[in-house]
Amino acid sequence: MKKIITRFRAYQLGNAGSSFSYFADNHFTLIEARLTEVNKETLKSELKICCKSQIDCLHITSWDQDHCSVQQLKEILETYLPKRIEFPGYTPHTESGKESLQVIKKYLRSMEKKKKIIAQSITPEYITSLDNATEFGYNNILHHPKFISNNSNDNSTIKHFRKGSFNVLSLGDVESSMISSSLSRQKTTQKETDVMILAH
């Protein structure tokens, strides 16, 4: 197993919601678009420890406000200039979700002439287009959504971060027992999960 400097951080927000980061192989991912007065300084400190001034990837699992706040999303984009944004593949049904999607599109337009930004909607079609995962590899795995459900929580993105010396499985807000059963049968999740971010 190759040595890779790897860090995982869970941030307190001071209110309902979630915020995490995963750093591996000099790549910093912020999980969820949340930035409050409580986690601002800790995020800044974590980036400094990782010798980073910008975020490489902003990974948003759900359009719900506790995962993606419109104003906080704007601040993250303006302050940390992520090179890649991974956002939910289902159509937002709330006003805050719809506005958040427009904020991402506006950011892409504003950065068009400055640098290349990749924005990827994590849809079932996108997941199907990816290569099959191999065991004990160093590539991340997107497990879900493999279909669009009537329950928006079950459309959350499930991602297995496997770029580092330890792995993190992020479950978004998925509630379905069918999805959890399918996930638990995967050899990669059985054998390669060190940290699990539970649905809440």
Question: Language-model segments: what does each one mean?
Answer:
Residues 1-54, 119-198:
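Core dinuclear metal-dependent hydrolase active-site scaffold
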Residues 35-38, 64-68, 91-94, 175-178:
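Short acidic, S/G/P-rich loop/turn micro-motifs used as interaction or catalytic elements
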Residues 86-88, 98-140:
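Extended active-site neighborhood of metal-dependent phosphoesterases/phosphodiesterases
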